């Protein structure tokens, strides 16, 4: 009754029978799924000598524990996420393929020392088609950041490195690369600093 009273205040009308019909149709659809305890399926396959390929989503620097907090996602995007997500022991992880772009991109807010907020960055964005596949939101683009790449390789235990989209850089006469950071006190480092917003590259 209270719920209905609130809806009446806002003059919100809905057909409860129709809403229930959609809900129960969804329930019946879900019942068709073949649900399994995936940790058993994956581990039995590994024990049988089969190869499992696990693909992670999002970049390593968006990892909730090891990324550029608070500009991160809500989960672990690094290799360790395969262990917690699949129920696989770390000792069972074999090869780790690190896939990276020949330039850097970022979606949304967060530190981006090599970001190009100029015509070069826009050309890179257009040539690389760096727009969100769902929203069409433009990605921020910049030169590759080698200390960040090395950090990602370290925390993921990368065994094989694969570069993609190198052809995007063919349109540029000059290609720049970040090899380190200059701290506010003038010192140089090749490690990602705790506070990265006030540094020079």
Predicted feature residues:
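Non-transmembrane, aqueous-exposed alpha-helical and coiled segments at domain scale
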Residues: 1-201
